[in-house]
C-alpha cells in the first residue's frame, strides 16, 4: 500500500510538473501600448484591395516600383504568403496575380539585366519546400503590370522567411533570411536564359528573424530578429551590431518589417515594424539614433494598420497624394475582409514626428 501510495505520489508530482509549469500569457494589447514609448498618429491615404486568401494570416510584405516619368502610374507588389504575388496600382486596384504558392517576403530592383535586356527584377522568398529555401525570380512589366516567372535559385537549407535586395559593384544580391536566423547573401545573375545565384556571404542571428533592408549607399544590411530587436551588418561583415532592442519601449516584439528612407550620401531613416503594439519605430541615419514612433490609425474612410508584418518605404514623387514619398504597411486586421496593405504619405509621417 505504501509502495502504491509512493508511486501515486510520484505520478501526481510528474503530472503537476507538466500541467503546473508556468504558462507564458500574452500581455493585453492595451497594456503593451501603455508600457511602450509614445507614438504619434497618422492616417492612410489609400489601401489596396484585399489579397485573395480570406480569413487567414496571408498578406505579408510589399515592394514598390516608382514610375519616374509618370509617378501616379507606379506599382506595388505584395505577397499573399499562401498563394502568390499581387500587383497593385496606387489606387489600390489589383492589376495582376501570379500563382507562386507560399512566397513570404518580396523586394525588387529596376535596371537589372534580365535575359539580355534591362528590366525590373522581383525576388520573393519561396517557402514551398520548408527544408530547402529558394529565391523565386520574376520580371515585372511596367506597362502591363504583369509578372513573368523566371525560375528559382537555391537559398540554403532551412525555411525561407525574409528577403531584401542590394546592389553594389558586384551586381544585385538577394539577402535571404531563414527562419532560424541564418542570412545568406546570394549574388544573382539573371542575364541569361536561366537565372543563377552564388552565395558570397553567410551571417547568423540567434533566433527567428525575417524583415530586412539594404542601404545601397553604404552596403549596410539591417535585419529584424523578432524577439530581440534590430541589427546591422556592415558591408562584407558577418558580425551584427545592435541598433534597437525589442525592450517593450522603443520596439515591442515582434520586430518585423524593415524599410529605409535614403537622403543624401548617408542620411535618412530606418523604420521597423513594432508589431506587438501596432506601431513603427524610426531611427535616424547615419547615427542610428532613436527618433520616435508612429502609428497608422483609423481615418474617415480608411482603417488603420495592426499587427504589421512587412513594410516598405520609398522617397520621391508618387503623384498628388504622395508627393514626398510612400510608406506601405501590411494590415493584419482589415475588418471582416482579407488582409491588405495601407498606403501612407511619407510627408504626413515627417510632419507628425517633426523630422527634417
Language-model segment annotations:
Residues 13-14:
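Residue-level signal for mature regions of secreted extracellular proteins and peptides
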Amino acid at each position: 500500500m505504501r509502495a502504491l501510495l509512493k508511486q501515486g505520489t510520484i505520478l501526481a508530482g510528474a503530472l503537476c510538473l507538466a500541467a503546473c509549469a508556468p504558462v507564458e500569457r500574452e500581455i493585453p494589447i492595451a497594456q503593451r501600448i501603455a508600457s511602450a514609448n509614445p507614438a504619434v498618429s497618422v492616417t492612410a491615404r489609400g489601401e489596396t484591395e484585399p489579397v485573395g486568401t480570406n480569413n487567414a494570416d496571408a498578406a505579408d510584405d510589399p515592394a514598390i516600383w516608382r514610375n519616374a516619368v509618370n509617378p501616379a502610374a507606379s506599382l506595388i507588389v505584395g505577397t499573399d504568403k499562401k498563394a502568390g504575388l499581387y500587383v497593385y496600382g496606387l489606387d489600390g486596384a489589383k492589376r495582376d496575380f501570379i500563382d507562386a504558392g507560399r512566397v513570404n517576403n518580396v523586394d525588387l530592383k529596376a535596371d537589372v539585366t534580365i535575359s539580355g535586356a534591362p528590366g525590373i527584377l522581383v525576388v520573393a522568398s519561396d517557402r514551398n519546400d520548408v527544408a530547402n529555401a529558394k529565391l523565386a525570380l520574376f520580371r515585372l512589366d511596367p506597362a502591363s503590370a504583369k509578372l513573368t516567372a523566371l525560375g528559382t535559385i537555391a537559398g540554403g537549407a532551412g525555411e525561407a522567411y525574409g528577403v531584401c535586395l542590394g546592389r553594389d559593384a558586384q551586381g544585385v544580391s538577394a539577402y535571404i533570411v531563414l527562419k532560424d536566423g541564418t542570412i545568406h547573401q546570394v549574388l544573382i545573375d539573371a542575364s541569361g536564359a536561366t537565372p543563377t545565384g552564388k552565395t558570397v556571404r553567410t551571417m547568423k542571428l540567434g533566433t527567428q528573424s525575417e524583415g530586412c533592408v539594404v542601404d545601397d549607399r553604404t552596403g549596410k544590411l539591417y535585419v529584424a530578429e523578432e524577439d530581440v530587436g534590430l541589427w546591422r551588418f556592415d558591408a562584407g561583415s558577418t558580425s551584427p551590431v545592435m541598433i534597437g532592442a525589442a525592450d517593450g519601449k522603443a520596439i515591442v516584439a515582434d520586430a518585423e518589417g524593415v524599410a529605409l528612407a535614403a537622403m543624401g550620401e548617408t542620411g535618412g531613416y530606418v523604420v521597423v515594424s513594432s508589431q506587438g503594439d501596432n506601431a513603427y519605430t524610426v531611427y535616424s541615419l547615419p547615427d542610428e539614433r532613436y527618433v520616435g514612433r508612429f502609428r497608422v490609425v483609423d481615418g474617415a474612410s480608411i482603417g488603420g494598420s495592426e499587427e504589421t508584418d512587412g513594410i516598405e518605404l520609398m522617397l520621391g514623387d508618387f503623384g498628388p497624394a504622395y508627393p514626398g514619398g510612400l510608406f506601405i504597411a501590411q494590415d493584419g486586421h482589415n475588418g471582416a475582409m482579407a488582409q491588405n496593405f495601407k498606403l501612407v504619405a511619407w510627408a504626413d509621417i515627417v510632419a507628425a514626428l517633426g523630422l527634417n
